[in-house]
Amino acid sequence: MLAELSPAVIAEVKLAATLLASKERICILTGAGISAESGIPTFRDKQTGLWENYGVEDLATPEAFARDPKLVWSWYQWRRQVVADKVPNPAHHALAQWQYHAQTSDQTVTLITQNVDDLHEQAGSAVTHLHGHLWRDRCAQCEIPYPEQSRTAYIKQDTIRFDDKLITCPHCVGYIRPDIV
């Protein structure tokens, strides 16, 4: 069901649609708000449970990984578990449809996201991730990508062990880290 909009907002939407219809290249930037509707917490939301005593800078920076890689890995394992069962919402699907239909017109719709989840891809979009991707890993030393993680392994709570031994790179023995900046 569509939300009821005021006449002023409807007029703005119609104007935007008219202006965008005549453009050949459109670039859309999305952020946390689009995935929040699917139940994914944003960085502005208060951390919950085990993580409420940590700031983002304690968990989501290269310095944090250098200081305490097991803590950072534990947090990312938790984040993966939070995201694993989430599905795209109508906004994700609308953008995917827009991209799909643009292929048969003279429009190019480029989608860029600040999000690290894969909800745009699940909806069918081609997307560029500015800050990395939650399901990819890479070596902290030589930057070689490590095989992608399966989201299905994270759906059951008992599949996550926070005390797992750190994975080392087969090329240089550096630690594997989440591919997120």
Q: Model-flagged regions — what are they?
A:
Residues 1-181:
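Conserved catalytic core of sirtuin-type NAD+-dependent deacylases
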